[in-house]
Design a protein with these regions (language model features):
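Phosphate/pyrophosphate- and phosphate-bearing ligand-binding catalytic cores of soluble enzymes
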Residues: 4-5, 11-14, 56, 148-303, ...
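Generic non-transmembrane alpha-helix signal with a bias for helix starts/N-cap capping motifs
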Residues: 33, 91, 263, 308-309
Length: 331
C-alpha cells in the first residue's frame, strides 16, 4: 500500500483538470483495502474511489480527502465460461484475455478506457453489449458497514450508465474488488450496431469470432475517439437521451433519429446543431465524434463548466432536450 500526499488530480484523470488531493493511496492487494479505509477513518477524511480516471472530472479546489486507486490485479477461471477479474485490471485487458480464449460476451467493449472495477458502476456498454448481460456478481468492500460483501447482479439496479454504485443513497459506498462474469461460446451475428455494420459491409467481413469483433471495434473506436495519452478527454461526455413516447414522437416529427427504447443519440444532436469542431472556453467538440469534449487549453474546471453549460443551452433551444454529463465529478 502506497500513501502519497498532495497529489495533482489532473495527473490522475484523463481530462487533466483538478487541484490537489490530500492523500492518494494505491491499493495493490485485497488486504490494502481495509487498511486504506481505516487510514481515512482515523484521519476523519472522506474517501473517493478511482480507477484510471477516464470517467472522472477533477475540480479546481481539489479533494480534501483520500483517493483510493484500485490497482489490484488478477484474472482467473471459475469454470469453462465463468471468470473472476480483479477490479484494478484494465477492462480492455480483460476483453483481450477473453477473446483470445474465443469467449463471447464482452468483445464489443474493446478499447473502452477504464478498469474492471468501474465497469459495473457505469454498466459500461457499446455496440449492443453491456456488462450487465454477462455480470453475475461483484465482491466489494462496504465502506459504510466496514466489511467485505458479495453483491448479486439483481441487487445492483443496473440501467443505462448507472447502478447502485453511482446513484442514490449508496453511491460511493462500495469499492469493487472483483467482478464475476459468465461468458458464452456463441458469437455475435449481423446485423450489428450502425457503425459496426457499416464497417462489416465496407470491408466485406465474414469472420465474426470474438477476436475479429474485437479488432473491428478497436479500429472503429480509435478512428473516432482521442487516445487519452494524446489528447485530454473523458471520452463520451454526454449521455444519450431517453424519452417517453410523446417526446419521442415530437422528436421524430423534427426528423431526429429515435432508436429502439426511445433513445436519441446525443452526438447526433450536437453534430446537427453545428457544434462539431467548435471551441468553448478552451474545450473543443471533437471533429470526429460530437459526443467527445477535448481539453485543448482549459486550465480549470470553471472553463469546462462554462463550455458544458453553453452546449447544453444550445441543444435545449434547438431541440427542447437537456443533455446530461456522463463523467462524474470528484467531490
Amino acid at each position: 500500500m502506497k500513501i502519497n500526499e498532495n497529489v495533482k488530480i489532473k495527473e490522475l484523470t484523463t481530462m487533466r483538470l483538478g487541484g490537489l488531493a490530500r492523500y492518494v493511496i494505491e491499493l495493490e492487494t485485497v488486504e490494502d483495502v481495509e487498511k486504506a479505509y481505516l487510514f481515512a477513518k482515523e484521519h476523519q477524511l472522506p474517501v473517493f474511489i478511482l480507477g484510471t480516471g477516464s470517467n472522472v472530472i477533477g475540480k479546481d479546489e481539489g479533494f480534501k480527502g483520500v483517493i483510493l486507486l484500485n490497482r489490484i490485479k488478477g484474472i482467473r477461471f471459475i469454470d469453462e465460461l465463468t471468470i473472476d477479474a480483479m477490479g484494478g485490471e484494465l477492462l480492455d485487458d480483460l476483453v483481450a484475455f477473453t477473446t483470445e480464449k474465443n469467449l463471447s460476451g464482452i468483445e464489443a467493449l474493446s478499447a473502452i478506457p477504464g478498469t474492471v472495477g468501474a465497469a459495473p458502476v457505469q454498466n459500461v456498454g457499446a455496440y449492443g453489449q453491456e456488462i450487465e448481460q454477462v455480470l453475475e456478481s461483484v465482491h466489494a468492500y462496504d465502506l459504510k458497514e466496514e466489511k467485505y460483501v458479495t453483491i448479486k447482479k439483481e441487487d445492483m439496479n443496473l440501467g443505462y450508465r448507472q447502478s447502485i454504485f453511482n446513484q442514490g443513497k449508496d453511491a460511493g459506498r462500495y469499492l469493487i474488488i472483483s467482478m464475476r462474469i459468465h461468458l458464452s461460446h456463441d458469437t455475435l451475428t449481423p446485423p450489428f450496431y450502425t457503425s459496426l455494420q457499416s464497417y462489416v459491409e465496407k470491408h466485406q467481413i465474414t469472420d465474426f469470432s470474438p477476436k475479429s469483433i474485437r479488432e473491428m471495434v478497436t479500429e472503429i473506436r480509435w478512428s473516432k475517439l482521442p487516445k487519452p495519452e494524446e489528447m485530454a478527454s473523458s471520452g463520451s461526455f454526454f449521455k444519450n437521451v431517453y424519452l417517453d413516447d410523446q417526446e419521442a414522437e415530437r422528436l421524430r416529427s423534427m426528423n431526429v433519429p429515435v432508436w429502439e427504447g426511445n433513445k436519441v443519440p446525443s452526438g447526433w444532436l450536437i453534430d446537427h446543431a453545428g457544434l462539431k469542431g467548435k471551441s468553448f472556453y478552451g474545450m473543443r467538440v471533437s471533429e470526429k465524434a460530437a459526443l467527445i469534449l477535448i481539453n485543448e487549453s482549459a486550465q480549470s474546471y470553471a472553463h469546462l463548466k462554462q463550455a458544458r453549460e453553453e452546449i447544453v443551452s444550445i441543444i435545449e433551444k434547438k431541440y427542447g432536450l437537456t443533455l446530461k454529463q456522463e463523467p462524474v465529478e470528484l467531490e
